[in-house]
């Protein structure tokens, strides 16, 4: 008789399958973590799967820091903590960690420990192709999940094109801002000047499709604590810009109805995007501090809020001789309103909101 072939596996990544294994994922993970190997464990992922016959199976991806040589076929046997039963796995070297991880992930009932290790075979894809990977990334539920898929399955692209991948993923997975919840109902503002109310009614009082193209913006000047910010932010979905301009995808959204620009120095706005913003211009480009230039969809008006004074008043700023041409343009593209008092009734606000201020 020919000699019996000895069991021997030499691998850095190991794929284990435990048929008819009644252990929970957590019990299996604890026991596998306790197995002594000649190389440190880096990552373990375990999936529990019910086969057609109703029997539970466990699938395990084990990644190590370096290659190990396994000659003990019983090394990965698991033991039931409640009865006299041993569970012996099928043991294979994992040629493509990404393929095995995808297989283990397929039913979703998983547990993992450590950090998944990208290997060179993942770059060649095994059964993965670039189109498969990018299709999977597009179907991901979040930016983070999409980038992780590409990191695991297309590591060359991830390393060499990370900036482009991140920029594109941010655009694809950009979510609408969480709606801002007004502290006070719009009905609280009972002293809104007629020109402000007319401006708001003409824009927010009609269907979006019926709104005029490049609707004029409005510049509201008034003392602090007159309620102008709360009023402006209570009208609908908006971008809120204060202090400085940040058009990154984290803070500025295209799919809103208007912009609120609050306490932005007019000198600063003149150097940046005065005409783009106040003129509700469409499809304009801005440079980002981090990342490539971004094209802003635009086409929405602004409510600009400012305080009186030579450094903050937009009206005083435009009266300067060097701003004569800008003043003429701004008067054609916006409405000015100077508040004479609070936009709310002090007594009514006090009785309904206690010590709160608008």
From Swiss-Prot:
GO terms for molecular function: ATP binding; DNA binding; endodeoxyribonuclease activity, producing 5'-phosphomonoesters; helicase activity; metal ion binding; nucleotidyltransferase activity; structural molecule activity. It comes from the Viruses. InterPro entries: CRESS_DNA_REP, Gemini_AL1_CLV, Gemini_AL1_REP, Gemini_AL1_REP_central. Its cofactor is Mg(2+); Mn(2+). The active site is at residue 103. Its EC number is 2.7.7.-, 3.1.21.-. Essential for the replication of viral ssDNA. The closed circular ssDNA genome is first converted to a superhelical dsDNA. Rep binds a specific region at the genome origin of replication. It introduces an endonucleolytic nick within the conserved sequence 5'-TAATATTAC-3' in the intergenic region of the genome present in all geminiviruses, thereby initiating the rolling circle replication (RCR). Following cleavage, binds covalently to the 5'-phosphate of DNA as a tyrosyl ester. The cleavage gives rise to a free 3'-OH that serves as a primer for the cellular DNA polymerase. This is Replication-associated protein.
């Amino acid at each position: 008789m020919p000699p019996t072939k000895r069991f021997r596996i030499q691998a850095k990544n190991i794929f284990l399958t435990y048929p008819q294994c009644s252990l929970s994922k957590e019990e299996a993970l604890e026991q596998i973590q306790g197995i002594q190997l000649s190389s440190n464990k880096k990552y373990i992922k375990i999936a529990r799967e019910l086969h057609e016959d109703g029997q539970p199976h466990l699938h395990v991806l084990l990644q190590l820091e370096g290659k190990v040589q396994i000659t003990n076929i019983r090394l990965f046997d698991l033991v039931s903590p409640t009865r006299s039963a041993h569970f012996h796995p099928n043991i294979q070297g994992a040629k493509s960690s990404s393929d095995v991880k995808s297989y283990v992930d397929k039913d979703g009932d998983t547990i993992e420990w450590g950090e998944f290790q990208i290997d060179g075979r993942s770059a060649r894809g095994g059964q993965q192709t670039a189109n498969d990977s990018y299709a999977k990334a597009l179907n991901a539920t979040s930016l983070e999940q999409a980038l992780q898929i590409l990191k695991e399955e297309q590591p060359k692209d991830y390393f060499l094109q990370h900036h482009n991948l991140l920029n594109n993923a941010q655009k694809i997975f950009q979510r609408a801002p969480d709606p801002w919840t007004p502290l006070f109902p719009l009905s609280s503002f009972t002293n809104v000047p007629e020109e402000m109310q007319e401006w708001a009614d003409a824009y927010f009082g009609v269907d979006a499709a019926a709104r005029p193209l490049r609707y004029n913006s409005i510049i509201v000047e008034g003392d602090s604590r007159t309620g102008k910010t709360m009023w402006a932010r209570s009208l609908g979905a908006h971008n809120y810009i204060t202090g400085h301009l940040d058009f990154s995808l984290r803070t500025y959204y295209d799919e809103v109805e208007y912009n609120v620009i609050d306490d932005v120095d007019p000198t600063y706005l003149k150097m940046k995007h005065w005409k783009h913003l106040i003129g509700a211009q469409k499809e304009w480009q801005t440079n980002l501090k981090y990342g490539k230039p971004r094209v802003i969809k635009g086409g929405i008006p602004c409510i600009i809020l400012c305080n009186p004074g030579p450094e903050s008043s937009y009206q005083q700023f435009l009266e300067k001789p060097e701003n004569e041409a800008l003043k003429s343009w701004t008067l054609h593209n916006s409405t000015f309103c100077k508040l004479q008092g609070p936009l709310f009734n002090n007594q009514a606000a006090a009785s309904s909101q206690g010590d709160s201020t608008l």
